[in-house]
């Protein structure tokens, strides 16, 4: 999903933003992203924390229950709603691959009918405020617990 940035936009005193990096090794591209909050808006801060927490919750379900990509995103949607957010399916996860990602697999993680393999898929969680005021994003590769701090 590529969108042009609006010219002249600057972070304000009470903003939420994300960094999205795509490190490359030869022709292969990874992906990682996280939201940050400037200021002290409690809703924005909770949204950013919840996006990362939901990522790890879904990743844990992937490890324990060996669910398909479809089932993982259905679970993420239920959990997001229980937390008071909407899950944005415009960012449905993707295969790690050469760029563009569709060169190896044309579908998204949310559409995958089998269990995604470790180190091959990016799980994307994008939460939105139900009133559309802000959102938060967290994404990383599906990896086991050894790759994350306890």
Positions of PLM-derived features:
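Active-site neighborhoods and metal-handling regions in enzymes and metal-associated proteins
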Residues: 1-150
